[in-house]
């Protein structure tokens, strides 16, 4: 049915983070440090108790999670990648419990600077793949490189459809 007060936003609350619903070159998961609100153009994320927001955000920025986002999401005209709430739950992210919090914050700050300065997202993925997947979690560098190739192939396929 049509809302009686169509001009009112139906649900306003301050989330811990936002995951952009529709993306161009790569998906974006951002910490909400300024108590911003949003309509449903972005997924509003509220972390469970015991989940450290910085760990959650950093755990997303790697080749594995980007490849799974392309696999789980859907592609629309112009090469847009859309990720729905149910699809978000299918994206694999590494568990970073063993990574010291100072290191998490340091890496997240570097990723943030790359993104804010419109740098190449692959610089951020290189950093997190090397520092987290390889150095902390024991992935072989060749495996990370193969997974990056998978993400790039899926990304190119999506972008070329537009």
Language-model features and meaning:
Residues 97-162:
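Non-catalytic DNA-recognition/assembly elements of restriction-modification systems
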Residues 1-113:
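Polybasic, glycine- and aromatic-enriched phosphate-binding surface used to engage nucleic acids
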């Amino acid at each position: 049915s049509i809302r009686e007060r169509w001009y009112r936003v139906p649900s306003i609350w301050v989330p811990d983070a936002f995951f952009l619903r529709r993306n161009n070159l790569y998906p974006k998961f951002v910490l909400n440090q300024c108590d911003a609100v949003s309509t449903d153009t972005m997924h509003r994320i509220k972390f469970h108790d015991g989940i450290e927001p910085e760990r959650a955000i950093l755990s997303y920025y790697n080749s594995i999670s980007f490849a799974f986002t392309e696999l789980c999401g859907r592609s629309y005209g112009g090469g847009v990648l859309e990720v729905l709430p149910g699809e978000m739950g299918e994206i694999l992210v590494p568990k970073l419990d063993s990574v010291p919090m100072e290191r998490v914050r340091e890496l997240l700050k570097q990723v943030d600077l790359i993104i804010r300065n419109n740098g190449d997202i692959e610089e951020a993925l290189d950093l997190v793949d090397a520092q987290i997947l390889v150095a902390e979690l024991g992935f072989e560098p060749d495996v990370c490189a193969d997974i990056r190739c998978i993400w790039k192939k899926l990304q190119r396929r999506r972008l070329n459809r537009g």
